[in-house]
Amino acid sequence: MTKFVKIAAVAAALLGTAPAFAATSVTGAAPSATARIIRPLTLTATGSLNFGTIVMNNVTANRTVTVNPDGSITCAVELVCDTTGSFVTYNVTGTNGQTVNIIKNTSTLTGSNSGSLTLTPVGANSVVLTNSGAPGKDFPIGGSIDIAPTTIDGVYTGTVDVQVDYN
Amino acid sequence: MTGRRIALLSFGALLAGALGMSGPAPAQCRLCATPSTQTITSADSDNMRIEIEARLDFDQLVVRDNSPGSVQLQPDGSSTISGSVGAISGRAMVGTAMVHGEPGRFVRVDMPTAITLHGIRGGTIRLDSLVTDLQSAPRLDSEGMLQFRFGGALHIESNADGDFRGDIPITVDYL
Protein backbone atom coordinates (compact mmCIF):
# COMPACT_ATOMS: atom_id res chain seq x y z
CA MET A 1 0.00 0.00 0.00
CA THR A 2 2.82 2.33 0.87
CA LYS A 3 4.60 1.51 -2.35
CA PHE A 4 1.44 2.27 -4.33
CA VAL A 5 1.15 5.66 -2.70
CA LYS A 6 4.77 6.60 -3.47
CA ILE A 7 4.39 5.74 -7.12
CA ALA A 8 1.26 7.87 -7.23
CA ALA A 9 3.14 10.78 -5.70
CA VAL A 10 5.90 10.54 -8.32
CA ALA A 11 3.37 10.36 -11.12
CA ALA A 12 1.55 13.36 -9.73
CA ALA A 13 4.79 15.30 -9.52
CA LEU A 14 5.61 14.49 -13.15
CA LEU A 15 2.18 15.46 -14.39
CA GLY A 16 2.10 18.57 -12.26
CA THR A 17 5.34 20.04 -13.56
CA ALA A 18 4.58 23.19 -15.50
CA PRO A 19 5.74 22.86 -19.08
CA ALA A 20 8.75 25.05 -19.82
CA PHE A 21 7.71 27.30 -22.72
CA ALA A 22 10.43 28.97 -24.79
CA ALA A 23 10.76 32.74 -24.16
CA THR A 24 8.75 34.65 -26.79
CA SER A 25 10.86 36.67 -29.08
CA VAL A 26 10.12 38.79 -32.11
CA THR A 27 12.45 40.48 -34.48
CA GLY A 28 11.11 43.45 -36.34
CA ALA A 29 11.93 44.31 -39.92
CA ALA A 30 15.48 45.64 -39.77
CA PRO A 31 15.48 49.40 -39.78
CA SER A 32 17.98 50.82 -42.11
CA ALA A 33 20.73 53.22 -41.26
CA THR A 34 21.68 55.62 -44.00
CA ALA A 35 24.26 58.29 -44.64
CA ARG A 36 25.32 60.41 -47.55
CA ILE A 37 28.96 61.38 -47.47
CA ILE A 38 29.90 64.21 -49.72
CA ARG A 39 33.01 66.20 -50.44
CA PRO A 40 33.02 69.99 -50.64
CA LEU A 41 32.20 71.47 -54.01
CA THR A 42 34.76 73.47 -55.91
CA LEU A 43 33.88 75.78 -58.78
CA THR A 44 36.29 77.28 -61.28
CA ALA A 45 35.71 79.19 -64.50
CA THR A 46 37.55 79.62 -67.76
CA GLY A 47 36.80 82.00 -70.56
CA SER A 48 34.60 85.07 -70.48
CA LEU A 49 31.08 86.07 -71.46
CA ASN A 50 31.25 88.36 -74.44
CA PHE A 51 28.22 89.79 -76.28
CA GLY A 52 30.39 91.33 -78.98
CA THR A 53 29.20 94.55 -80.56
CA ILE A 54 25.54 95.55 -80.36
CA VAL A 55 24.27 98.36 -82.57
CA MET A 56 21.15 100.13 -81.39
CA ASN A 57 18.96 100.95 -84.42
CA ASN A 58 16.17 103.24 -83.26
CA VAL A 59 15.26 101.11 -80.30
CA THR A 60 11.71 101.84 -79.23
CA ALA A 61 11.34 99.30 -76.41
CA ASN A 62 13.42 97.04 -74.21
CA ARG A 63 15.14 94.50 -76.45
CA THR A 64 16.97 91.40 -75.25
CA VAL A 65 20.27 90.06 -76.49
CA THR A 66 21.24 86.54 -75.42
CA VAL A 67 24.52 84.71 -75.65
CA ASN A 68 23.46 81.08 -75.57
CA PRO A 69 25.54 78.42 -73.76
CA ASP A 70 26.82 77.25 -77.15
CA GLY A 71 28.08 80.75 -78.07
CA SER A 72 25.37 81.62 -80.57
CA ILE A 73 23.66 84.99 -80.15
CA THR A 74 19.94 85.61 -80.18
CA CYS A 75 19.38 89.19 -81.23
CA ALA A 76 16.11 91.08 -80.92
CA VAL A 77 14.66 93.43 -83.49
CA GLU A 78 15.93 96.99 -83.69
CA LEU A 79 19.37 95.69 -82.73
CA VAL A 80 22.24 94.51 -84.85
CA CYS A 81 24.41 91.90 -83.15
CA ASP A 82 27.38 89.73 -83.93
CA THR A 83 26.63 86.22 -85.06
CA THR A 84 28.50 84.59 -82.23
CA GLY A 85 29.85 85.57 -78.84
CA SER A 86 31.72 83.69 -76.16
CA PHE A 87 30.48 81.92 -73.08
CA VAL A 88 32.01 80.96 -69.73
CA THR A 89 32.95 77.36 -69.05
CA TYR A 90 32.62 76.39 -65.39
CA ASN A 91 34.08 73.28 -63.79
CA VAL A 92 32.58 71.83 -60.62
CA THR A 93 34.06 69.00 -58.53
CA GLY A 94 32.48 67.12 -55.66
CA THR A 95 31.09 63.63 -55.02
CA ASN A 96 30.31 61.13 -57.72
CA GLY A 97 26.66 60.62 -58.50
CA GLN A 98 25.40 63.69 -56.69
CA THR A 99 23.20 66.29 -58.30
CA VAL A 100 24.56 69.81 -58.13
CA ASN A 101 22.24 72.79 -58.46
CA ILE A 102 23.50 75.72 -60.49
CA ILE A 103 22.39 79.00 -59.00
CA LYS A 104 22.41 81.84 -61.49
CA ASN A 105 22.21 85.31 -59.97
CA THR A 106 21.84 88.58 -61.83
CA SER A 107 24.68 91.07 -61.73
CA THR A 108 25.33 94.59 -62.91
CA LEU A 109 27.48 95.59 -65.85
CA THR A 110 28.87 99.12 -65.59
CA GLY A 111 29.23 101.29 -68.70
CA SER A 112 32.36 103.20 -69.64
CA ASN A 113 30.20 106.25 -70.24
CA SER A 114 28.11 105.66 -67.13
CA GLY A 115 24.94 103.70 -67.27
CA SER A 116 24.45 100.10 -66.28
CA LEU A 117 22.97 96.92 -67.62
CA THR A 118 21.59 93.93 -65.75
CA LEU A 119 23.18 90.65 -66.72
CA THR A 120 21.21 87.42 -66.25
CA PRO A 121 23.24 84.20 -66.60
CA VAL A 122 21.74 81.58 -68.90
CA GLY A 123 22.35 77.85 -68.74
CA ALA A 124 21.41 74.52 -67.16
CA ASN A 125 19.81 74.42 -63.72
CA SER A 126 21.79 71.43 -62.50
CA VAL A 127 24.41 68.85 -63.38
CA VAL A 128 25.10 65.35 -62.14
CA LEU A 129 28.67 64.63 -61.16
CA THR A 130 30.14 61.58 -62.82
CA ASN A 131 33.24 61.33 -60.66
CA SER A 132 34.58 62.37 -57.28
CA GLY A 133 37.16 65.12 -57.22
CA ALA A 134 39.04 65.67 -60.46
CA PRO A 135 38.25 66.04 -63.30
CA GLY A 136 34.80 67.16 -62.20
CA LYS A 137 32.09 68.27 -64.58
CA ASP A 138 32.09 71.18 -67.03
CA PHE A 139 29.05 73.24 -67.83
CA PRO A 140 28.67 76.35 -70.04
CA ILE A 141 27.00 79.59 -68.99
CA GLY A 142 25.84 82.31 -71.33
CA GLY A 143 23.87 85.41 -70.46
CA SER A 144 21.23 87.91 -71.50
CA ILE A 145 20.96 91.68 -71.24
CA ASP A 146 18.15 94.11 -71.97
CA ILE A 147 18.87 97.11 -74.16
CA ALA A 148 16.46 99.96 -73.47
CA PRO A 149 15.82 103.01 -75.65
CA THR A 150 17.68 105.00 -72.99
CA THR A 151 20.68 102.71 -72.76
CA ILE A 152 23.88 104.72 -73.04
CA ASP A 153 26.40 103.46 -75.53
CA GLY A 154 29.81 102.37 -74.36
CA VAL A 155 31.72 99.34 -73.13
CA TYR A 156 29.98 97.49 -70.33
CA THR A 157 31.91 95.21 -67.98
CA GLY A 158 31.16 93.24 -64.86
CA THR A 159 31.23 89.77 -63.32
CA VAL A 160 29.10 86.71 -63.82
CA ASP A 161 27.51 85.51 -60.59
CA VAL A 162 27.11 81.72 -60.58
CA GLN A 163 27.11 79.44 -57.53
CA VAL A 164 26.70 75.71 -57.04
CA ASP A 165 25.25 73.63 -54.24
CA TYR A 166 24.33 70.00 -53.66
CA ASN A 167 20.73 69.20 -54.27
CA MET B 1 -4.73 -8.72 -6.96
CA THR B 2 -6.50 -7.76 -10.13
CA GLY B 3 -7.51 -4.39 -8.65
CA ARG B 4 -3.90 -3.73 -7.60
CA ARG B 5 -2.61 -4.59 -11.08
CA ILE B 6 -5.10 -2.29 -12.72
CA ALA B 7 -4.01 0.55 -10.46
CA LEU B 8 -0.34 -0.05 -11.31
CA LEU B 9 -1.12 -0.22 -15.00
CA SER B 10 -3.06 2.99 -14.75
CA PHE B 11 -0.14 4.79 -13.17
CA GLY B 12 2.19 3.19 -15.69
CA ALA B 13 0.09 4.65 -18.48
CA LEU B 14 0.14 8.05 -16.82
CA LEU B 15 3.92 7.93 -16.44
CA ALA B 16 4.42 6.86 -20.06
CA GLY B 17 2.22 9.71 -21.18
CA ALA B 18 4.17 12.19 -19.06
CA LEU B 19 7.54 10.96 -20.29
CA GLY B 20 6.31 10.94 -23.88
CA MET B 21 5.32 14.60 -23.87
CA SER B 22 7.39 16.58 -26.38
CA GLY B 23 7.49 20.31 -26.47
CA PRO B 24 5.22 22.68 -24.70
CA ALA B 25 1.81 21.05 -24.52
CA PRO B 26 -0.88 23.45 -23.49
CA ALA B 27 -3.03 21.73 -20.87
CA GLN B 28 -4.87 22.40 -17.74
CA CYS B 29 -2.93 21.60 -14.64
CA ARG B 30 -5.04 19.10 -12.73
CA LEU B 31 -2.66 17.82 -10.12
CA CYS B 32 -0.99 21.04 -9.04
CA ALA B 33 -1.19 22.20 -5.50
CA THR B 34 -3.13 25.23 -6.73
CA PRO B 35 -5.01 24.05 -9.79
CA SER B 36 -5.46 26.59 -12.52
CA THR B 37 -8.11 26.46 -15.21
CA GLN B 38 -6.38 29.11 -17.32
CA THR B 39 -5.15 27.78 -20.61
CA ILE B 40 -1.51 28.52 -21.28
CA THR B 41 -1.15 29.30 -24.97
CA SER B 42 1.73 30.02 -27.26
CA ALA B 43 0.11 33.28 -28.46
CA ASP B 44 2.61 35.47 -26.60
CA SER B 45 4.68 35.93 -29.72
CA ASP B 46 1.54 36.42 -31.80
CA ASN B 47 0.62 39.66 -30.05
CA MET B 48 4.07 41.24 -29.93
CA ARG B 49 5.45 43.16 -32.82
CA ILE B 50 7.92 45.92 -33.58
CA GLU B 51 7.23 48.86 -35.80
CA ILE B 52 10.05 50.95 -37.15
CA GLU B 53 8.79 54.49 -37.22
CA ALA B 54 11.99 56.15 -38.44
CA ARG B 55 15.31 54.85 -39.64
CA LEU B 56 18.60 56.13 -38.30
CA ASP B 57 19.52 58.73 -40.90
CA PHE B 58 22.74 60.71 -40.76
CA ASP B 59 21.54 62.54 -43.89
CA GLN B 60 24.35 64.53 -45.48
CA LEU B 61 27.88 64.63 -44.07
CA VAL B 62 30.52 66.88 -45.57
CA VAL B 63 34.08 65.58 -45.30
CA ARG B 64 36.86 68.06 -45.74
CA ASP B 65 39.66 65.77 -46.85
CA ASN B 66 40.75 62.17 -47.09
CA SER B 67 41.61 61.72 -43.43
CA PRO B 68 39.35 59.63 -41.17
CA GLY B 69 36.42 61.21 -39.43
CA SER B 70 33.42 60.29 -37.34
CA VAL B 71 30.04 61.54 -36.31
CA GLN B 72 27.95 60.38 -33.37
CA LEU B 73 24.18 60.76 -33.23
CA GLN B 74 22.73 60.23 -29.75
CA PRO B 75 19.17 58.99 -29.13
CA ASP B 76 18.28 62.44 -27.84
CA GLY B 77 19.21 63.93 -31.22
CA SER B 78 22.46 65.58 -30.18
CA SER B 79 25.49 65.01 -32.38
CA THR B 80 29.25 65.35 -32.29
CA ILE B 81 31.65 65.38 -35.20
CA SER B 82 35.39 64.83 -35.36
CA GLY B 83 38.25 64.42 -37.80
CA SER B 84 37.55 65.14 -41.44
CA VAL B 85 33.78 65.49 -40.94
CA GLY B 86 33.12 69.15 -41.37
CA ALA B 87 29.39 69.30 -40.89
CA ILE B 88 26.29 67.21 -40.35
CA SER B 89 23.01 68.15 -41.90
CA GLY B 90 20.27 69.53 -39.70
CA ARG B 91 17.97 66.89 -41.16
CA ALA B 92 19.84 64.02 -39.51
CA MET B 93 17.41 61.85 -37.51
CA VAL B 94 17.72 59.21 -34.83
CA GLY B 95 15.95 55.93 -35.32
CA THR B 96 12.57 55.34 -33.63
CA ALA B 97 10.86 52.04 -32.95
CA MET B 98 7.59 51.06 -31.26
CA VAL B 99 7.04 47.74 -29.53
CA HIS B 100 3.47 46.46 -29.26
CA GLY B 101 2.58 43.63 -26.86
CA GLU B 102 0.95 42.71 -23.60
CA PRO B 103 0.40 45.65 -21.25
CA GLY B 104 2.73 45.76 -18.31
CA ARG B 105 5.14 43.12 -19.54
CA PHE B 106 8.85 43.63 -19.06
CA VAL B 107 10.87 43.21 -22.23
CA ARG B 108 14.48 42.99 -23.31
CA VAL B 109 15.58 44.76 -26.48
CA ASP B 110 18.63 43.49 -28.30
CA MET B 111 20.57 45.26 -31.04
CA PRO B 112 23.98 44.51 -32.51
CA THR B 113 26.84 46.62 -31.22
CA ALA B 114 28.03 47.42 -34.72
CA ILE B 115 27.02 47.00 -38.34
CA THR B 116 28.47 47.77 -41.74
CA LEU B 117 26.95 50.25 -44.15
CA HIS B 118 27.49 49.49 -47.82
CA GLY B 119 27.91 52.11 -50.49
CA ILE B 120 25.71 52.12 -53.55
CA ARG B 121 28.84 52.59 -55.61
CA GLY B 122 30.93 50.27 -53.48
CA GLY B 123 32.90 50.71 -50.29
CA THR B 124 31.84 50.32 -46.69
CA ILE B 125 31.74 52.37 -43.53
CA ARG B 126 31.27 51.23 -39.95
CA LEU B 127 28.42 52.14 -37.63
CA ASP B 128 29.03 51.20 -34.00
CA SER B 129 28.21 52.26 -30.45
CA LEU B 130 24.56 51.58 -31.22
CA VAL B 131 22.61 52.76 -28.20
CA THR B 132 18.97 53.29 -27.19
CA ASP B 133 17.23 55.59 -24.72
CA LEU B 134 15.56 52.66 -22.95
CA GLN B 135 15.58 52.46 -19.16
CA SER B 136 17.34 49.59 -17.43
CA ALA B 137 14.11 47.58 -17.14
CA PRO B 138 11.94 48.51 -20.11
CA ARG B 139 8.29 47.72 -19.75
CA LEU B 140 5.29 47.99 -22.00
CA ASP B 141 2.86 50.61 -20.79
CA SER B 142 -0.80 50.15 -19.90
CA GLU B 143 -1.65 50.12 -23.59
CA GLY B 144 0.98 47.55 -24.39
CA MET B 145 3.32 49.97 -26.13
CA LEU B 146 6.91 50.98 -25.69
CA GLN B 147 8.63 53.52 -27.90
CA PHE B 148 12.37 54.00 -27.95
CA ARG B 149 14.94 55.85 -29.98
CA PHE B 150 18.38 54.71 -31.05
CA GLY B 151 21.55 56.27 -32.36
CA GLY B 152 25.16 55.37 -33.07
CA ALA B 153 28.60 56.47 -34.23
CA LEU B 154 29.57 56.51 -37.89
CA HIS B 155 33.24 56.11 -38.80
CA ILE B 156 34.41 57.35 -42.18
CA GLU B 157 37.69 56.23 -43.61
CA SER B 158 39.65 57.99 -46.32
CA ASN B 159 38.14 58.36 -49.80
CA ALA B 160 34.69 57.24 -48.71
CA ASP B 161 31.91 59.20 -50.31
CA GLY B 162 28.46 58.62 -51.75
CA ASP B 163 25.30 57.01 -50.41
CA PHE B 164 25.61 54.27 -47.80
CA ARG B 165 23.01 51.99 -46.29
CA GLY B 166 22.87 49.16 -43.75
CA ASP B 167 20.30 47.21 -41.73
CA ILE B 168 20.04 47.11 -37.92
CA PRO B 169 18.16 44.01 -36.68
CA ILE B 170 16.26 44.59 -33.43
CA THR B 171 14.95 41.71 -31.33
CA VAL B 172 12.53 42.02 -28.43
CA ASP B 173 11.87 39.32 -25.81
CA TYR B 174 9.38 39.12 -23.02
CA LEU B 175 11.07 38.60 -19.67
PLM regions: where:
Chain A
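Bacterial N-terminal signal peptides that target proteins for export
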Residues: 1-9
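N-terminal signal peptide c-region/cleavage motif recognized by signal peptidases
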Residues: 17-18
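N-terminal small/polar-rich segments of proteins
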Residues: 23-102, 129-167
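Short acidic, flexible loop segments centered on an aromatic residue
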Residues: 102-109
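Short beta-strand and strand-turn-strand segments in soluble, beta-rich domains
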Residues: 113-125
